[in-house]
Amino acid sequence: MENFQGYLEKYEFCQHQCLYPLLFQEYIYALAYDYDLNTCLFSESVDELISYDNKYSSVLVKRLITRMYQQNYLINSVNHSKFNSFIANNHFFYSHFYSQMISEGFGIILEIPFSLEFLSFSKRKKRLKLQNLRSIHSIFSFLEDKLLXFHXMSDILIPYPIHFEILIQILQYWIQDISFLHLVRFFFFEYLNWNTLITSKNWVSIFLKENQRLFRFLYNSYVSEYEFVFLFLSTKSSYLRFTSFGIFLERIYFYGKIKHFRIVYVTSLQRTLWFFTDSFIHYVRYQGKAILSSRGTFLLMKKWKSYLVCFWQYYFHFWFQPNRILINQFFNYSFYFFGYLLSLKKNHLVVRGQILENSVLIDTMNNQLDTIVPVIXLIRSLSIATFXTXSGHPISKPIWADLSDRDILTRFGRISRNLFHYYSGSSKKWGLYRIKFILRLSCARTLARKHKSTVRTFMQKLGGMFLEEFFTEEEQVLSLVFQKIIHFSLHRSNRERIWYLDIIRINDLVNYFELRS
């Protein structure tokens, strides 16, 4: 990567040339236009090429491009037909493998200028290593903010592009490499059929799949374009005076809120998350869902809805269905976001004040987002994963019955601990113990099914070891966050809001009901 840093510095960030001419030269055109190769591969060492990913290197990508073309050329010359070998049934496996490797390699190369920009941004900023922040992740800072005098909120589903050409046009704003744009169109048209994936109603499920780096890059470019223009226009409004907002993308360091703004593109992460807050508006987005709340009236929120619909229509040239933006009163509305059931909670604080001989009671009230464990949605997810029935009755997991006893205990215990860690900051966690009970009994039924015994027998046989896999001491977990161990009673731990989960890695069970909320 360092070898090409000097090349990138010659251009402005938004006007740089892509790296494909340096790496692949005429093979891009040969592949896109089905022309013959008249020259041989030029030779260079692996160290001279960009290869910061062990699995997908540019050398392998270039070799696969040549091999795919040669295979296509031989078939066309022998059969004298116009069919493309990429969609030929006899070569489906190789076509899928080649296309996957090439798309992953291209995605890595595309991320290089953005990664360099992010690294330079990180070096210029001082990282605050605070050890006792109440929340250690960005999304939870949003959940703990005091929403004073906020009345209405909009639940927004960001529309997916109806045609892949919209994504290509967005890339044209900052990429001037015509060969790259032709190659992307080639992938869309000839093999991957990305248009079907993009226009699918379950487009968010693509994020759950592996090896979709190129699509994530295209989709993140599309969302970044929307948010860049949205933020630029919103700063011109008298209702949106920004006071504090920030971007949180790190998973290791603890960050405090900052009072300046810098757009950072990071597409190597599978999920990009950021938010900003000010005294007039709250906005947070995760994947394709955004929450917009404001102090303004209901009429102002309707104006924002009309603005967003027109914005997508005239800027991205496709229709934004108005029913994808729901406007509700905060006090009478609960909504799913980031795997939580959120509602507005009123907190009363009564303070006794003494003025001369008179005693006065001062009742103050503030609004706070109440994070509730979505028990019904989690049980539905467990039912889909065959851990329980739709009513929450634990059942065995037959597909795991062939594993060793230790592996079965480890898998069930890992799922239980991950869910407990993720929802540890919820204000009410009683439902979480029900989920743990379902997983624990499902594990016992799976072991009993494997050894053709009863659940009671295995519960007595395993004893403490079985409980150890499912119940982690809270003091041990909290000691990882705080410098000293804090002792909590069971009643207090049910109300304490302590977060210690890596927000970038979301449990698959959480994503399931996010798609259906």
Swiss-Prot record:
Compartments it resides in: Plastid, Chloroplast
GO cellular component, one term: chloroplast
Keyword Nucleotide-binding listed: no
One GO MF term: RNA binding
Pfam short name (any one): Intron_maturas2
GO BP, sorted A to Z: mRNA processing; RNA splicing; tRNA processing
Domain of life of the source: Eukaryota
Keywords from the UniProt entry: Chloroplast, mRNA processing, Plastid, RNA-binding, tRNA processing
Homology family: Belongs to the intron maturase 2 family. MatK subfamily.
Record PANTHER family: MATURASE K (PTHR34811:SF1)
Function: Usually encoded in the trnK tRNA gene intron. Probably assists in splicing its own and other chloroplast group II introns.
UniProt protein name: Maturase K
The organism of origin for this protein: Juncus effusus
UniProt lineage: Eukaryota, Viridiplantae, Streptophyta, Embryophyta, Tracheophyta
